[in-house]
């Protein structure tokens, strides 16, 4: 996660020029706007690009990755539909990076460089209304992935609408992703109490059918922010439960991930919900989903919305069988 100032003003009009682009005047603004959310010290990426020295050292990798379209990571086709929070470079920006590298990657005048973004690695919500922290958990060495669920202690005496939600991993290198749920049944707490270690293990969800998904974090993602006038209802007395996915590890690690939430203050809020609408069990129309070896089959699923609704986001997801997927919105 990040906190930065000055980047919103870092807009530059590139004109055709004979000289080689420089880091300070041409390249830094592109990198700060599209890359350093992940590529900073302590960020999701494995190397930093926040300084000229960083970028110069990795210049050939940066050129290759941007020319191939591998970076910044953005699987949706920008030519089909423009989506919110796109990480897409223009061809002009790609060419500027390539020309900079081919020209020896000069720094230029450092006084002309844009401000370096400040990454606190803490919170995009500086003053959250609610912070919930999981108990310290010792992640054991394992040859397989671990999906561990934790019930977080919160005080929520009344219904409130979430307008911002972020997950701050306690140990970024080992946290693959985090799902955030609310549970009004108390069943998650029962499962937690039955395990002598902090939390309990469950694959696919938190083991409570009635629980509602309210947030998702993956490396490089920003805080969830709802459209203006809309919010996700957090019910009074609900338990906040997170499922943390840890990959196979060869050493003992410690994690204490937390969730920050900001509530809406408008007198009227339109309710948002995150719901699975197409799956391989309930909505499949020509199941069951069984595929014999060396067989190719096509399946269909259909969902009819029970109410008039607005779709604000879509998130295709697969655990074990999926190799690739396409979604059209």
Where are the language model's segments positioned?
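Bacterial Sec-dependent N-terminal signal peptides
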Residues: 1-21
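Short linear sequence motifs
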Residues: 6-7, 93, 193, 210
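A generic structural signal for solvent-exposed, polar alpha-helical segments
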Residues: 9-10, 29, 58, 80, ...
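Aromatic- and Gly/Pro-enriched helix-to-coil junctions and flexible linker segments
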Residues: 16-152, 239-243
């Amino acid at each position: 996660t990040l906190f930065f100032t000055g980047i919103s003003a870092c807009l530059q009009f590139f004109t055709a020029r004979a000289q080689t682009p420089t880091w300070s005047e041409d390249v830094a603004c592109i990198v700060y706007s599209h890359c350093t959310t992940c590529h900073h010290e302590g960020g999701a990426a494995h190397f930093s690009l926040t300084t000229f020295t960083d970028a110069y050292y990795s210049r050939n990798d940066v050129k290759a990755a941007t020319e191939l379209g591998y970076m910044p990571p953005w699987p949706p086709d920008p030519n089909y539909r423009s989506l919110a929070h796109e990480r897409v470079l223009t061809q002009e920006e790609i060419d500027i990076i390539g020309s900079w590298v081919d020209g020896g990657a000069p720094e230029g005048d450092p006084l002309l460089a844009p401000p370096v973004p400040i990454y606190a690695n803490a919170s995009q919500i500086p003053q959250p209304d609610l912070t919930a922290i999981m108990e310290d958990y010792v992640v054991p060495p394992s040859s397989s992935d671990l999906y561990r669920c934790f019930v977080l202690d919160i005080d929520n005496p009344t219904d409130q609408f979430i307008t911002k939600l972020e997950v701050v991993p306690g140990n970024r290198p080992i946290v693959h992703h985090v799902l955030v749920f609310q549970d009004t049944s108390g069943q998650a707490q029962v499962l937690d109490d039955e395990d002598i270690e902090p939390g309990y293990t469950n694959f696919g969800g938190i083991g409570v059918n009635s629980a509602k998904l309210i947030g998702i974090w993956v490396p490089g993602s920003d805080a969830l922010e709802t459209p203006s006038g809309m919010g996700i209802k957090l019910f009074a007395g609900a338990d906040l439960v997170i499922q943390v996915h840890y990959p196979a590890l060869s050493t003992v690690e410690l994690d204490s991930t937390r969730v920050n939430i900001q509530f809406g203050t408008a007198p009227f809020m339109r309710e948002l919900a995150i719901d699975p609408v197409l799956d391989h069990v309930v909505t499949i129309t020509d199941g069951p989903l069984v595929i014999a070896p060396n067989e190719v089959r096509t399946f269909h699923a259909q969902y009819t919305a029970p109410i008039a609704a607005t779709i604000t986001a879509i998130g295709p997801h697969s655990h074990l069988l999926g190799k690739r997927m396409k979604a059209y919105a």
